[in-house]
Amino acid sequence: MTIQSEAALEEGLIKTLVGNSYERVIIKEEENLRENFKRQLEKHNRRELEVNGRTGFTDAEFDRILLHLEGGTRFEKAKKLRDLYTLQTDDGKNIWVEFLNTKKWCQNEFQVANQITVEGRKKCRYDVTILVNGLPLVQIELKKRGVELKQAYNQVQRYHKTSFHGLFDYIQIFVISNGVNTRYFANNPNGGYKFTFNWTDKDNKPFNELNLFANFFFDKCTLGKIISKYIVLHEGEKSLMVLRPYQYYAVEEILNRVENTNKNGYVWHTTGAGKTLTSFKAAQLVSEIDGIDKVIFVVDRHDLDTQTKSEYDAFEPNAVDSTDNTGQLIARLSGDPGLLSKFNIKTNSKITITTIQKLNCAVTKDYYNKHLQDVRNKKVIMIFDECHRSHFGDCHKNIVGFFKNLQIFGFTGTPI
Protein backbone atom coordinates (compact mmCIF):
# COMPACT_ATOMS: atom_id res chain seq x y z
CA MET A 1 0.00 0.00 0.00
CA THR A 2 1.42 3.39 -1.01
CA ILE A 3 1.42 6.04 1.72
CA GLN A 4 0.74 9.55 0.45
CA SER A 5 3.79 11.75 1.00
CA GLU A 6 3.67 15.10 2.73
CA ALA A 7 4.52 16.84 -0.56
CA ALA A 8 1.62 15.10 -2.33
CA LEU A 9 -0.72 16.04 0.52
CA GLU A 10 0.46 19.65 0.23
CA GLU A 11 -0.09 19.83 -3.52
CA GLY A 12 -3.51 18.22 -3.18
CA LEU A 13 -4.55 20.84 -0.64
CA ILE A 14 -3.30 23.69 -2.81
CA LYS A 15 -5.19 22.25 -5.78
CA THR A 16 -8.37 22.21 -3.66
CA LEU A 17 -7.84 25.84 -2.62
CA VAL A 18 -7.16 26.98 -6.18
CA GLY A 19 -10.33 25.14 -7.20
CA ASN A 20 -12.14 27.26 -4.60
CA SER A 21 -10.88 30.45 -6.32
CA TYR A 22 -7.80 31.10 -4.20
CA GLU A 23 -4.92 32.69 -6.08
CA ARG A 24 -1.74 30.66 -5.84
CA VAL A 25 1.22 32.94 -5.26
CA ILE A 26 4.92 32.10 -5.13
CA ILE A 27 6.46 33.50 -1.95
CA LYS A 28 9.81 32.10 -0.92
CA GLU A 29 10.97 34.54 1.75
CA GLU A 30 9.83 37.45 3.89
CA GLU A 31 10.78 40.12 1.35
CA ASN A 32 8.44 38.47 -1.18
CA LEU A 33 5.77 38.38 1.53
CA ARG A 34 6.04 42.12 2.15
CA GLU A 35 5.98 42.91 -1.58
CA ASN A 36 2.86 40.80 -2.06
CA PHE A 37 1.26 42.35 1.03
CA LYS A 38 1.72 45.84 -0.43
CA ARG A 39 0.05 44.83 -3.70
CA GLN A 40 -2.84 43.08 -1.97
CA LEU A 41 -3.38 45.90 0.52
CA GLU A 42 -3.56 48.39 -2.34
CA LYS A 43 -6.02 46.14 -4.15
CA HIS A 44 -8.18 45.74 -1.05
CA ASN A 45 -8.19 49.50 -0.37
CA ARG A 46 -8.48 50.62 -4.00
CA ARG A 47 -11.75 52.52 -3.46
CA GLU A 48 -10.33 54.55 -0.58
CA LEU A 49 -7.22 55.20 -2.64
CA GLU A 50 -9.23 56.23 -5.72
CA VAL A 51 -11.33 58.67 -3.67
CA ASN A 52 -8.07 60.35 -2.72
CA GLY A 53 -6.78 60.35 -6.30
CA ARG A 54 -4.24 57.60 -5.72
CA THR A 55 -3.45 54.16 -7.08
CA GLY A 56 -1.22 52.90 -4.29
CA PHE A 57 1.04 53.63 -1.34
CA THR A 58 4.50 55.14 -1.69
CA ASP A 59 7.37 53.14 -0.22
CA ALA A 60 7.56 55.58 2.69
CA GLU A 61 3.83 55.25 3.36
CA PHE A 62 4.02 51.47 3.24
CA ASP A 63 6.93 51.56 5.69
CA ARG A 64 4.69 53.50 8.08
CA ILE A 65 2.00 50.84 7.70
CA LEU A 66 4.55 48.11 8.46
CA LEU A 67 5.83 50.05 11.47
CA HIS A 68 2.26 50.31 12.78
CA LEU A 69 1.73 46.57 12.31
CA GLU A 70 5.02 45.58 13.95
CA GLY A 71 4.23 47.05 17.37
CA GLY A 72 2.48 45.23 20.20
CA THR A 73 1.78 41.73 21.42
CA ARG A 74 0.13 38.97 19.42
CA PHE A 75 -3.17 39.89 21.13
CA GLU A 76 -2.78 43.59 20.30
CA LYS A 77 -1.99 42.69 16.70
CA ALA A 78 -5.23 40.71 16.47
CA LYS A 79 -7.00 43.96 17.39
CA LYS A 80 -5.04 45.94 14.81
CA LEU A 81 -6.08 43.42 12.16
CA ARG A 82 -9.73 44.25 12.83
CA ASP A 83 -9.30 48.03 13.20
CA LEU A 84 -8.90 50.76 10.62
CA TYR A 85 -5.53 52.50 10.51
CA THR A 86 -5.28 56.23 9.85
CA LEU A 87 -2.36 56.66 7.47
CA GLN A 88 -0.84 60.09 7.08
CA THR A 89 0.24 60.27 3.45
CA ASP A 90 3.38 61.93 2.17
CA ASP A 91 1.32 64.97 1.10
CA GLY A 92 -0.23 65.39 4.56
CA LYS A 93 -3.63 63.81 3.99
CA ASN A 94 -5.23 61.19 6.23
CA ILE A 95 -6.68 58.07 4.62
CA TRP A 96 -8.24 55.00 6.20
CA VAL A 97 -6.47 51.69 5.63
CA GLU A 98 -8.47 48.49 6.17
CA PHE A 99 -6.64 45.21 6.77
CA LEU A 100 -9.69 42.95 7.03
CA ASN A 101 -13.29 43.48 5.94
CA THR A 102 -15.16 42.02 8.92
CA LYS A 103 -18.59 43.16 7.71
CA LYS A 104 -18.50 41.76 4.17
CA TRP A 105 -16.04 38.95 4.77
CA CYS A 106 -16.42 37.41 1.30
CA GLN A 107 -14.93 40.58 -0.20
CA ASN A 108 -11.42 39.98 1.14
CA GLU A 109 -8.60 38.82 -1.15
CA PHE A 110 -7.59 35.16 -0.61
CA GLN A 111 -4.28 33.64 -1.69
CA VAL A 112 -2.33 30.46 -0.93
CA ALA A 113 1.43 30.03 -0.76
CA ASN A 114 3.65 27.17 0.31
CA GLN A 115 7.17 26.57 1.57
CA ILE A 116 7.78 30.15 2.73
CA THR A 117 11.21 30.34 4.36
CA VAL A 118 11.52 32.51 7.47
CA GLU A 119 14.69 33.28 9.39
CA GLY A 120 14.39 33.56 13.15
CA ARG A 121 16.50 31.84 15.76
CA LYS A 122 16.36 29.03 13.21
CA LYS A 123 15.56 28.95 9.51
CA CYS A 124 12.13 27.37 9.01
CA ARG A 125 9.95 26.57 6.01
CA TYR A 126 6.21 26.59 6.54
CA ASP A 127 4.03 24.10 4.68
CA VAL A 128 0.93 25.99 3.46
CA THR A 129 -0.01 29.58 4.27
CA ILE A 130 -3.36 31.24 3.55
CA LEU A 131 -3.03 34.97 2.97
CA VAL A 132 -5.99 37.31 3.40
CA ASN A 133 -5.39 40.72 1.86
CA GLY A 134 -1.71 39.74 1.84
CA LEU A 135 -1.45 38.96 5.55
CA PRO A 136 -0.73 35.38 6.67
CA LEU A 137 -3.85 34.62 8.73
CA VAL A 138 -3.98 30.81 8.53
CA GLN A 139 -1.01 28.46 8.77
CA ILE A 140 -1.37 24.79 7.84
CA GLU A 141 1.17 22.20 8.93
CA LEU A 142 1.02 18.76 7.35
CA LYS A 143 2.42 15.33 8.10
CA LYS A 144 2.27 12.31 5.83
CA ARG A 145 -0.35 9.68 6.47
CA GLY A 146 0.55 7.40 9.34
CA VAL A 147 2.41 10.06 11.31
CA GLU A 148 0.86 11.02 14.65
CA LEU A 149 -1.01 14.32 14.31
CA LYS A 150 0.47 15.73 17.50
CA GLN A 151 3.83 15.93 15.73
CA ALA A 152 2.38 18.67 13.52
CA TYR A 153 1.11 20.48 16.62
CA ASN A 154 4.53 20.20 18.26
CA GLN A 155 6.10 21.63 15.12
CA VAL A 156 3.84 24.69 15.36
CA GLN A 157 4.92 25.10 18.98
CA ARG A 158 8.58 24.98 17.90
CA TYR A 159 7.88 27.67 15.31
CA HIS A 160 6.49 29.88 18.08
CA LYS A 161 9.80 29.59 19.89
CA THR A 162 12.18 29.80 16.96
CA SER A 163 10.77 31.67 13.96
CA PHE A 164 7.30 33.26 14.09
CA HIS A 165 7.68 37.03 14.01
CA GLY A 166 6.72 40.07 11.93
CA LEU A 167 3.68 39.55 9.74
CA PHE A 168 3.41 35.93 10.88
CA ASP A 169 2.32 37.26 14.28
CA TYR A 170 -0.99 37.98 12.52
CA ILE A 171 -1.84 34.29 12.14
CA GLN A 172 -5.31 33.75 13.59
CA ILE A 173 -5.84 30.02 13.06
CA PHE A 174 -3.62 26.98 12.72
CA VAL A 175 -4.68 23.80 10.95
CA ILE A 176 -2.81 20.52 11.36
CA SER A 177 -3.43 17.37 9.33
CA ASN A 178 -1.96 14.02 8.36
CA GLY A 179 -4.55 13.58 5.64
CA VAL A 180 -6.87 11.31 7.62
CA ASN A 181 -7.18 13.46 10.74
CA THR A 182 -7.45 17.24 10.66
CA ARG A 183 -7.76 19.70 13.53
CA TYR A 184 -7.82 23.49 13.91
CA PHE A 185 -7.01 25.85 16.78
CA ALA A 186 -6.59 29.54 17.55
CA ASN A 187 -3.19 31.21 17.64
CA ASN A 188 -2.77 30.83 21.38
CA PRO A 189 0.60 29.21 22.16
CA ASN A 190 -0.38 28.53 25.76
CA GLY A 191 -3.63 26.72 24.95
CA GLY A 192 -2.31 23.18 24.69
CA TYR A 193 -3.28 20.31 22.42
CA LYS A 194 -6.63 19.89 24.20
CA PHE A 195 -7.75 23.13 22.52
CA THR A 196 -7.38 21.69 19.02
CA PHE A 197 -10.71 20.69 17.49
CA ASN A 198 -12.16 18.61 14.69
CA TRP A 199 -14.63 20.37 12.41
CA THR A 200 -18.03 18.73 11.87
CA ASP A 201 -21.19 19.21 9.88
CA LYS A 202 -24.46 20.34 11.49
CA ASP A 203 -25.23 16.75 12.50
CA ASN A 204 -21.87 16.45 14.29
CA LYS A 205 -20.31 14.23 11.62
CA PRO A 206 -16.58 15.02 11.70
CA PHE A 207 -14.65 16.25 8.69
CA ASN A 208 -11.49 14.32 9.53
CA GLU A 209 -10.19 13.86 5.99
CA LEU A 210 -8.24 16.90 4.85
CA ASN A 211 -10.15 17.23 1.58
CA LEU A 212 -13.53 17.21 3.39
CA PHE A 213 -12.27 19.74 5.94
CA ALA A 214 -10.77 21.99 3.26
CA ASN A 215 -13.86 22.06 1.05
CA PHE A 216 -15.95 23.41 3.93
CA PHE A 217 -13.63 25.26 6.30
CA PHE A 218 -11.50 26.87 3.59
CA ASP A 219 -14.44 28.03 1.51
CA LYS A 220 -13.56 31.71 1.19
CA CYS A 221 -16.80 33.02 2.67
CA THR A 222 -16.77 30.48 5.51
CA LEU A 223 -13.15 31.16 6.44
CA GLY A 224 -13.68 34.91 6.17
CA LYS A 225 -16.70 34.65 8.44
CA ILE A 226 -14.91 32.50 11.03
CA ILE A 227 -11.97 34.90 11.22
CA SER A 228 -14.24 37.97 11.29
CA LYS A 229 -17.00 36.77 13.61
CA TYR A 230 -16.09 33.56 15.38
CA ILE A 231 -12.70 34.33 16.84
CA VAL A 232 -13.05 35.93 20.26
CA LEU A 233 -10.36 38.24 21.60
CA HIS A 234 -10.48 37.23 25.26
CA GLU A 235 -9.62 40.42 27.13
CA GLY A 236 -9.28 38.68 30.49
CA GLU A 237 -6.59 36.28 29.28
CA LYS A 238 -5.27 38.46 26.41
CA SER A 239 -5.61 35.50 24.09
CA LEU A 240 -7.47 34.35 20.99
CA MET A 241 -10.30 31.82 21.15
CA VAL A 242 -12.06 30.19 18.21
CA LEU A 243 -15.52 28.68 18.49
CA ARG A 244 -16.06 24.95 18.10
CA PRO A 245 -18.35 23.73 15.31
CA TYR A 246 -21.42 23.13 17.50
CA GLN A 247 -21.05 26.66 18.90
CA TYR A 248 -20.71 28.06 15.39
CA TYR A 249 -23.81 26.24 14.13
CA ALA A 250 -25.85 27.25 17.20
CA VAL A 251 -25.08 30.94 16.72
CA GLU A 252 -25.61 30.72 12.96
CA GLU A 253 -29.06 29.17 13.47
CA ILE A 254 -30.03 31.88 15.95
CA LEU A 255 -28.91 34.57 13.50
CA ASN A 256 -30.82 32.87 10.69
CA ARG A 257 -34.01 32.75 12.76
CA VAL A 258 -33.71 36.38 13.84
CA GLU A 259 -33.08 37.60 10.30
CA ASN A 260 -35.58 35.41 8.47
CA THR A 261 -38.30 34.17 10.86
CA ASN A 262 -40.12 34.90 14.11
CA LYS A 263 -39.43 31.43 15.47
CA ASN A 264 -38.08 30.91 18.97
CA GLY A 265 -35.57 28.19 19.87
CA TYR A 266 -33.26 26.75 22.47
CA VAL A 267 -29.64 25.60 22.58
CA TRP A 268 -28.47 22.69 24.67
CA HIS A 269 -24.76 22.37 25.47
CA THR A 270 -23.44 19.75 27.87
CA THR A 271 -21.65 20.96 31.00
CA GLY A 272 -18.23 22.34 30.12
CA ALA A 273 -19.06 22.75 26.43
CA GLY A 274 -18.77 26.55 26.42
CA LYS A 275 -22.38 27.66 26.84
CA THR A 276 -21.34 31.09 28.14
CA LEU A 277 -19.15 31.76 25.11
CA THR A 278 -21.90 30.64 22.72
CA SER A 279 -24.52 32.83 24.40
CA PHE A 280 -22.14 35.82 24.46
CA LYS A 281 -21.35 35.49 20.77
CA ALA A 282 -25.05 35.01 19.94
CA ALA A 283 -26.04 38.13 21.91
CA GLN A 284 -23.22 40.16 20.39
CA LEU A 285 -23.95 39.24 16.77
CA VAL A 286 -27.73 39.51 17.16
CA SER A 287 -27.28 43.04 18.53
CA GLU A 288 -25.47 44.01 15.31
CA ILE A 289 -28.42 43.05 13.08
CA ASP A 290 -30.30 46.02 11.63
CA GLY A 291 -33.73 46.42 13.15
CA ILE A 292 -32.91 44.83 16.51
CA ASP A 293 -33.56 47.41 19.20
CA LYS A 294 -32.61 45.49 22.33
CA VAL A 295 -31.09 42.18 23.39
CA ILE A 296 -31.94 41.13 26.94
CA PHE A 297 -30.03 38.29 28.60
CA VAL A 298 -32.21 36.89 31.39
CA VAL A 299 -30.94 34.89 34.38
CA ASP A 300 -32.96 33.51 37.28
CA ARG A 301 -30.78 34.59 40.23
CA HIS A 302 -28.95 37.78 41.19
CA ASP A 303 -25.64 35.96 41.68
CA LEU A 304 -25.89 34.69 38.10
CA ASP A 305 -26.54 38.27 36.97
CA THR A 306 -23.21 39.35 38.46
CA GLN A 307 -21.42 36.19 37.32
CA THR A 308 -22.61 36.49 33.72
CA LYS A 309 -21.63 40.16 33.54
CA SER A 310 -18.17 39.25 34.84
CA GLU A 311 -17.79 36.41 32.31
CA TYR A 312 -18.97 38.58 29.41
CA ASP A 313 -16.60 41.38 30.47
CA ALA A 314 -13.74 38.87 30.31
CA PHE A 315 -14.58 38.32 26.64
CA GLU A 316 -15.10 42.01 25.89
CA PRO A 317 -15.28 44.70 28.61
CA ASN A 318 -18.44 46.82 28.61
CA ALA A 319 -20.00 44.90 25.74
CA VAL A 320 -23.08 44.40 27.92
CA ASP A 321 -24.82 46.35 30.69
CA SER A 322 -25.97 44.99 34.03
CA THR A 323 -28.67 46.34 36.34
CA ASP A 324 -28.60 46.62 40.13
CA ASN A 325 -32.31 47.33 40.47
CA THR A 326 -35.53 47.61 38.49
CA GLY A 327 -35.12 51.36 38.10
CA GLN A 328 -31.83 50.92 36.29
CA LEU A 329 -33.41 48.25 34.11
CA ILE A 330 -36.22 50.63 33.12
CA ALA A 331 -33.69 53.35 32.31
CA ARG A 332 -31.64 51.05 30.09
CA LEU A 333 -34.62 49.51 28.28
CA SER A 334 -36.38 52.81 27.68
CA GLY A 335 -33.27 54.81 26.86
CA ASP A 336 -34.99 57.79 28.48
CA PRO A 337 -32.32 60.53 28.95
CA GLY A 338 -33.88 61.69 32.20
CA LEU A 339 -33.88 58.21 33.72
CA LEU A 340 -30.36 57.49 32.47
CA SER A 341 -29.20 60.71 34.12
CA LYS A 342 -31.10 59.90 37.33
CA PHE A 343 -29.22 56.63 37.69
CA ASN A 344 -25.92 58.16 36.52
CA ILE A 345 -25.76 55.85 33.50
CA LYS A 346 -23.15 57.17 31.06
CA THR A 347 -23.36 54.52 28.33
CA ASN A 348 -26.24 52.31 27.25
CA SER A 349 -25.42 49.15 25.30
CA LYS A 350 -27.95 47.30 23.14
CA ILE A 351 -27.32 44.23 25.34
CA THR A 352 -28.62 44.21 28.92
CA ILE A 353 -28.27 41.46 31.54
CA THR A 354 -30.99 41.24 34.18
CA THR A 355 -32.87 38.79 36.37
CA ILE A 356 -36.28 37.42 35.52
CA GLN A 357 -37.55 38.87 38.81
CA LYS A 358 -36.54 42.45 37.91
CA LEU A 359 -37.92 42.04 34.41
CA ASN A 360 -41.22 40.72 35.75
CA CYS A 361 -41.45 43.67 38.14
CA ALA A 362 -40.72 46.08 35.27
CA VAL A 363 -43.55 44.80 33.08
CA THR A 364 -46.23 44.21 35.75
CA LYS A 365 -46.04 47.39 37.85
CA ASP A 366 -47.58 50.48 36.28
CA TYR A 367 -45.01 52.69 38.01
CA TYR A 368 -42.35 51.05 35.85
CA ASN A 369 -44.05 49.82 32.69
CA LYS A 370 -45.38 53.27 31.79
CA HIS A 371 -41.79 54.01 30.72
CA LEU A 372 -41.68 50.92 28.50
CA GLN A 373 -44.58 51.64 26.16
CA ASP A 374 -42.23 52.54 23.32
CA VAL A 375 -39.82 49.61 23.63
CA ARG A 376 -42.62 47.06 24.12
CA ASN A 377 -43.51 47.45 20.42
CA LYS A 378 -39.92 47.33 19.16
CA LYS A 379 -37.97 44.27 18.07
CA VAL A 380 -36.59 42.71 21.24
CA ILE A 381 -34.56 39.51 21.50
CA MET A 382 -34.44 37.71 24.84
CA ILE A 383 -31.90 35.04 25.69
CA PHE A 384 -32.85 32.98 28.74
CA ASP A 385 -30.00 31.32 30.62
CA GLU A 386 -30.79 27.94 32.24
CA CYS A 387 -34.11 28.03 30.41
CA HIS A 388 -35.15 24.67 31.88
CA ARG A 389 -35.73 26.65 35.11
CA SER A 390 -36.85 30.08 33.91
CA HIS A 391 -38.95 29.32 30.85
CA PHE A 392 -42.11 28.53 32.80
CA GLY A 393 -44.46 30.08 35.38
CA ASP A 394 -46.17 33.43 35.85
CA CYS A 395 -43.02 35.55 35.50
CA HIS A 396 -42.31 34.15 32.07
CA LYS A 397 -45.97 34.47 31.07
CA ASN A 398 -46.06 38.13 32.14
CA ILE A 399 -42.89 38.99 30.22
CA VAL A 400 -43.96 37.26 27.01
CA GLY A 401 -47.38 38.88 27.21
CA PHE A 402 -45.97 42.39 27.61
CA PHE A 403 -43.59 42.63 24.64
CA LYS A 404 -45.38 42.69 21.29
CA ASN A 405 -42.45 41.96 18.96
CA LEU A 406 -40.46 39.49 21.01
CA GLN A 407 -38.29 36.57 19.96
CA ILE A 408 -36.90 34.18 22.58
CA PHE A 409 -33.93 31.83 22.69
CA GLY A 410 -33.08 29.62 25.62
CA PHE A 411 -29.74 28.16 26.69
CA THR A 412 -29.38 25.19 29.01
CA GLY A 413 -26.93 22.54 30.10
CA THR A 414 -29.78 20.29 31.23
CA PRO A 415 -31.70 18.18 28.69
CA ILE A 416 -35.26 19.45 28.25
Briefly describe each language-model feature range.
Residues H160-T162, A283-Q284, D336-L340, D366-H371, ...:
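A generic local structural motif
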Residues S177, T354, F411:
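Short glycine/serine/threonine-enriched helix-capping/active-site loop
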Residues D313-K365:
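Inter-Walker segment of RecA-like/P-loop motor cores
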Residues L149, Q357-I416:
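Signature of the SF2 helicase/ATPase Hel1-core->accessory helical subdomain module
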Residues K28-E30, D324-N325, G413:
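Proline- and acidic/polar-enriched loop/turn elements at helix boundaries
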